[in-house]
């Protein structure tokens, strides 16, 4: 299902309370520009989950897509790991 240069991210589901929408927190390591320390930066994305299959704390893969609402520009591709 390759669609050109669409970005993909892997993150954890931090909210599944909305219908057909999940909030995914993606953590990246960034070096501080002045001090050089590696800092964890968390970005939250709202993603479309058509079947409401992702649950809280699942590891999921999301892919960039067309704008689906005011905040949603990502969609669920697969659940990498179910929450324990």
From Swiss-Prot:
Q: According to its UniProt entry, what is the function of this protein?
A: One of the primary rRNA binding proteins, it binds specifically to the 5'-end of 16S ribosomal RNA.
Q: Give the protein name, as stated in the record.
A: Small ribosomal subunit protein uS17
Report the GO terms under cellular component.
Answer: cytosolic small ribosomal subunit
GO aspect biological process, one term: translation
Q: Which organism is it from?
A: Clostridium acetobutylicum (strain ATCC 824 / DSM 792 / JCM 1419 / IAM 19013 / LMG 5710 / NBRC 13948 / NRRL B-527 / VKM B-1787 / 2291 / W)
Q: Which family does it belong to?
A: Belongs to the universal ribosomal protein uS17 family.
Please provide, alphabetically and separated by semicolons, the GO molecular function terms listed in this UniProt record. rRNA binding; structural constituent of ribosome
Its quaternary organisation is:
Part of the 30S ribosomal subunit.
PANTHER family in the record: 40S RIBOSOMAL PROTEIN S11 FAMILY MEMBER (PTHR10744), SMALL RIBOSOMAL SUBUNIT PROTEIN US17M (PTHR10744:SF1)
InterPro entries attached to this UniProt entry: NA-bd_OB-fold, Ribosomal_uS17, Ribosomal_uS17_bact/chlr
Alphabetically sorted, this entry's keywords are: Ribonucleoprotein, Ribosomal protein, RNA-binding, rRNA-binding
Q: By its UniProt entry, which NCBIfam families does this protein fall under?
A: PRK05610.1, uS17_bact
